[in-house]
């Protein structure tokens, strides 16, 4: 990597920084930068500061999420409140404003499809005008809207939420799961992202972590995390491929594992290819068949579509282990002739035919990744499968045909990523000392130069963290400011790539064009997020450049979302407190009434009536429980319990005295009998 960098620097250095390209002389009004000599500086900084407390590893998935922590040298996947090791990445808002996360949200999706958000990870860090987003708007029942900054947000009951907020609500559930297990606050986290996520998507994921109250120590790539889970206890040196086909994204990474060093050689993928697309393809097939048989079009009925969507997902999963499944949805819809039921058989071969194009889309990225890593399939010692979709036999066969070997099933495809994130958390905390992770940036990073050309500063598959600099000059006489547009992608023209942000450097002393020397430095951190600084070499004065990104969340946005998340957390705490108090009160009422019936002969009638009045008051309080605090309900329940205990204490004393009287009376009679016998 170093030698390649030096070679690139040697080729580029030599054009005098004071010269301006001829093209600059023919473009009046150009306020950007001329393309001048390069100076590259490479930096690798893998050390981390000591972290206090546990670091949780979170796989924030498109369909499901998972959380793990290190216990000694082993990572442990944690069960949520429902007893499951994975949590659906689903968030819903009910009509009364209640927020549901995970399985409770997924269960009510059929009756509340317009306000139940799923697969929002596909929207994170994306613009509303992105073709993929526009495609998604036609496939989901909830509203995807254009935010004021042009990003894609979602809407429920008239309120707008950023995808980062929805992700934060899922992360809060993961955080709560970890805290319930640890018994204390979980503050630090490592969160995973698809390897092919760009800078905006990575930053938006970090924002989600911040909104949820987590300190995100590192954002790492999902295939890399899975490789850590696979190779932590392996001593053999080898090159492996990680084929990760999850709910919403596809990644392929080629890694070399050597004596505890996990070096990513290349990565590739598709951030809009996953299980959701397989579900959607099957849904379209079912809807088409239903219309052919009944003449009824289901596309306008969101509730019916949600039922079909859930049935499609279930059928997809069943066909991984069965060769045929039945899809039965009674009373799916109705027309003038009456109710309509959906009954159809689906074979594995039929399903494979429906999704064959989706599976084929994973082949080209795999071939490109091997080409970039300069390895052939014979060099790869193991192929690891990650993501729920890799359970599909046709996917496994495709992988085997592609790499010439049967894929390994050494890791759990649903849990490996979270386990790897926890291991990386252990590395950062200093608990795991024999592992070094060298990841790469998935996409080239550069700037727009004269004529709209995309000039690459950092090439794709460069090991991160890395730091590179380039010297620029002005393109016009007397120019006092320059505009720098930072882009990410592989196209030759800047306009065809993803615009990450633009910077304006002001305060340049007026001088003839080509004279000022402005050194712009791009610093790509271990999270794959870029930071930029600039220095006027003539004056030695360093300027701070703030990204004027056209999208993304501002600092104020994030602070407001943090407050909203805290508000929801407080509401959740109050709700939980109220539910626990209601359960306690209902238990006390039940126990009191049972004991009153059991001891009715021993209890004074007037005291019983008083207690019955207390129970009636308690029931009245429970009838308006939604407007009462948990503390009020708990206090009232405690008062009822104290009153009942006093009454039952009287009953016990009465019963005890009666038993004693009965016992002494029996003893006296026995003595008289013995006396008579002796006489």
UniProtKB/Swiss-Prot annotation:
Binding site for ADP: 63-64, 313, 316, 320, 388, 391
UniProt GO molecular function: ATP binding; ATP hydrolysis activity; ATP-dependent protein folding chaperone; unfolded protein binding
Key words, A-Z: Acetylation, ATP-binding, Chaperone, Cytoplasm, Hydrolase, Methylation, Mitochondrion, Nucleotide-binding, Nucleus, Phosphoprotein, Transit peptide
GO cellular component, one term: mitochondrial matrix
Documented activity regulation: The chaperone activity is regulated by ATP-induced allosteric coupling of the nucleotide-binding (NBD) and substrate-binding (SBD) domains. ATP binding in the NBD leads to a conformational change in the NBD, which is transferred through the interdomain linker (IDL) to the substrate-binding domain (SBD). This elicits a reduced substrate affinity and a faster substrate exchange rate. Upon hydrolysis of ATP to ADP, the protein undergoes a conformational change that increases its affinity for substrate proteins.
Transit peptide extent on chain: 1-46
Annotated EC: 3.6.4.10
Bias-annotated ranges (Basic and acidic residues): 669-679
In-chain residues carrying the UniProt-annotated modification Phosphoserine: 408
Pfam family, one: HSP70
Region annotated Substrate-binding domain (SBD), chain positions: 442-679
Gene3D superfamilies reported for this sequence: 1.20.1270.10, 3.30.30.30, 3.30.420.40, Actin, Chain A, domain 4, Substrate Binding Domain Of DNAk, Chain A, domain 1
Signal sequence region: none
Residues with N6-malonyllysine modification: 206
Catalytic reactions on record: ATP + H2O = ADP + phosphate + H(+)
Main enzyme class: hydrolase
Record PTM Omega-N-methylarginine, positions in chain: 513
Assembly with partners or alone: Interacts strongly with the intermediate form of FXN and weakly with its mature form. Interacts with HSCB. Associates with the mitochondrial contact site and cristae organizing system (MICOS) complex, composed of at least MICOS10/MIC10, CHCHD3/MIC19, CHCHD6/MIC25, APOOL/MIC27, IMMT/MIC60, APOO/MIC23/MIC26 and QIL1/MIC13. This complex was also known under the names MINOS or MitOS complex. The MICOS complex associates with mitochondrial outer membrane proteins SAMM50, MTX1, MTX2 and DNAJC11, mitochondrial inner membrane protein TMEM11 and with HSPA9.
Record's comment describing the protein's domains: The N-terminal nucleotide binding domain (NBD) is responsible for binding and hydrolyzing ATP. The C-terminal substrate-binding domain (SBD) binds to the client/substrate proteins. The two domains are allosterically coupled so that, when ATP is bound to the NBD, the SBD binds relatively weakly to clients. When ADP is bound in the NBD, a conformational change enhances the affinity of the SBD for client proteins.
Name under which the protein is recorded: Stress-70 protein, mitochondrial
């Amino acid at each position: 990597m170093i030698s390649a960098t030096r070679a690139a620097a040697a080729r580029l250095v030599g054009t005098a920084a004071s010269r301006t390209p001829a093209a600059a002389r023919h473009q009046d009004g150009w306020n950007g930068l001329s393309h001048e000599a390069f100076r590259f500086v490479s930096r690798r900084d893998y050390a981390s500061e000591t972290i206090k407390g546990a670091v949780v590893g979170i796989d924030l998935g498109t369909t499901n999420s998972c959380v793990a922590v290190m216990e000694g040298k082993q990572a442990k996947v944690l069960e949520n409140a429902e007893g499951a090791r994975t949590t659906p990445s689903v968030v819903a808002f009910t009509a009364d404003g209640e927020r549901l996360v995970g399985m409770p949200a997924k269960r009510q999706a059929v009756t509340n499809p317009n306000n139940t958000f799923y697969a929002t990870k596909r929207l994170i860090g994306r613009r509303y005008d992105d073709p993929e987003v526009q495609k998604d708007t036609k496939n989901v029942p909830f509203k995807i809207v254009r935010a004021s900054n042009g990003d894609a947000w979602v809407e429920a009951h008239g309120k707008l939420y950023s995808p980062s907020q929805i992700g934060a609500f899922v992360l809060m559930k993961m955080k709560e799961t970890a805290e319930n297990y640890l018994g204390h606050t979980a503050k630090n986290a490592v969160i995973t992202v698809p390897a092919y996520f760009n800078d905006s998507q990575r930053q938006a994921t970090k924002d989600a972590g911040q909104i949820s109250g987590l300190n995100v120590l590192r954002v790492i790539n999902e295939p890399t995390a899975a490789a850590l889970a696979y190779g932590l206890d392996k001593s053999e040196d080898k090159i492996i491929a990680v084929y990760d086909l999850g709910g919403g994204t596809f990644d392929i990474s080629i890694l070399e594992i050597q004596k505890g060093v996990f070096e990513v050689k290349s990565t590739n993928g598709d951030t809009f290819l996953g299980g959701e697309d397989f579900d959607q393809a099957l849904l379209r097939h079912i809807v088409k068949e239903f219309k052919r048989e009944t003449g009824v079009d289901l596309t306008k009925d969101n509730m019916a579509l949600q039922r079909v969507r859930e049935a499609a997902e279930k059928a997809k999963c069943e066909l991984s282990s069965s060769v045929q499944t039945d899809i039965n949805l009674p009373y799916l819809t109705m027309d003038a002739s009456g109710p309509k039921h959906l009954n159809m058989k689906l074979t594995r071969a039929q399903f494979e035919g429906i999704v064959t194009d989706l599976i084929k889309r994973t082949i080209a990225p795999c071939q490109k990744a091997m080409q970039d890593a300069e390895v052939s399939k014979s060099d790869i010692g193991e192929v690891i499968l990650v993501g729920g979709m890799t359970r599909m036999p046709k996917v496994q066969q495709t992988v085997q045909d592609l790499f010439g070997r049967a894929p390994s099933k050494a890791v759990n495809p649903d849990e490996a990523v979270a386990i790897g994130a926890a291991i990386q958390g252990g590395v950062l905390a200093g608990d795991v000392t024999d592992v070094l992770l060298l990841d790469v940036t998935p996409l080239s990073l550069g700037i727009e130069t004269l004529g709209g050309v995309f000039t690459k500063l950092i090439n794709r598959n460069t090991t991160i963290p890395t730091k590179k600099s380039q010297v620029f000059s002005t393109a016009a006489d007397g120019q006092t400011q320059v505009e720098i547009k930072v882009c990410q992608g592989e196209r030759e023209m800047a306009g065809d790539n993803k615009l990450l942000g633009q910077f304006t450097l002001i305060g340049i002393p007026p001088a003839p064009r080509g004279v000022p020397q402005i050194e712009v430095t791009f610093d790509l951190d271990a999270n794959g997020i870029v930071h930029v600084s600039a220095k006027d070499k003539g004056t030695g004065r360093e300027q701070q450049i703030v990204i004027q990104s056209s999208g993304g969340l501002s600092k104020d946005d994030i602070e407001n979302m943090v407050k909203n998340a805290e508000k929801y957390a407080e509401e959740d705490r109050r709700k939980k407190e109220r539910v626990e108090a209601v359960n306690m009160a209902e238990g006390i009422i039940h126990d009191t009434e049972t004991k009153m019936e059991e001891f009715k002969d021993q209890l004074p009638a007037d005291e019983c009536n008083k207690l019955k009045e207390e129970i009636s008051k308690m029931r009245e309080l429970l009838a308006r429980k939604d407007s009462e605090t948990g503390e009020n309900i708990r206090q009232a329940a405690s008062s009822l319990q104290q009153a009942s205990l006093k009454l039952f204490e009287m009953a016990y004393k009465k019963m005890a005295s009666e038993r004693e009287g009965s016992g002494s009376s029996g003893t006296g009679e026995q003595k008289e009998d013995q006396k008579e016998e002796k006489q």
